[in-house]
């Protein structure tokens, strides 16, 4: 049995296109980076290739949509030097630690350091906003009602209820969280 470094899953039309023409960056208009916490480390090498080489000569818009870790990855890719930004993110993310009994203020303070590493200055933020080819969109979950409580016990109770509601049906999560989309406005090439 042969082993392959990359497994391609595609529908019949896409698979025929890939077999006939190979992978061509111009064939892709949208890329989605899902959440997944530290699992994104498995994609780090592929990310370096995709945004350091494969998409580097792109002259048309590539819409990238990320949530959680995917949002951080893609915030790196919309910068002028995506490889360097991705390395900064990887370094910061892999070295973050929290004290055992950290409160939310300390967790927020420590987590903010990742933002400082991904965006060391306002220049990198502006690069994301002004990038003519890489158009960033982010999906976040906004806590609603009791889920947005600042008190630890209320929040823990709400998350427990949300988990239970999710077991019944994902539709019930709308009572606890709202999906919010952020995107970079403006014209695409």
Question: Where are the predicted features?
Answer:
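Gly/Ala-rich beta-loop-alpha elbow adjacent to hydrolase catalytic centers
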Residues: 66, 70
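Patatin-like phospholipase
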Residues: 1-63, 76-189
């Amino acid at each position: 049995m042969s082993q392959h470094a990359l497994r391609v899953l595609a529908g019949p039309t896409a698979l025929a296109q890939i077999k006939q023409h190979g992978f061509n960056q111009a064939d892709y208009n949208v890329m989605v980076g899902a959440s997944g916490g530290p699992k994104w480390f498995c994609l780090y090498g592929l990310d370096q290739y995709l945004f350091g080489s494969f998409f580097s000569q792109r002259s048309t818009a590539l819409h990238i949509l990320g949530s959680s870790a995917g949002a951080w990855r893609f915030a790196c890719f919309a910068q002028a030097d995506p490889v360097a930004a991705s390395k900064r993110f990887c370094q910061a993310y892999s070295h973050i630690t929290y004290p055992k009994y950290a409160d939310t203020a300390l967790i927020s303070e420590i987590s903010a350091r990742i933002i400082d590493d991904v965006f060391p200055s306002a220049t990198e933020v502006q690069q994301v906003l002004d990038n003519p080819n890489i158009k960033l969109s982010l999906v976040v979950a906004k806590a609603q009602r009791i889920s947005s409580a600042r008190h630890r016990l209320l929040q823990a109770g709400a998350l427990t209820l949300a988990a239970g509601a999710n077991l019944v049906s994902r539709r019930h999560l709308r009572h606890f969280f709202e999906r919010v989309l952020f995107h970079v406005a403006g014209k695409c090439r």
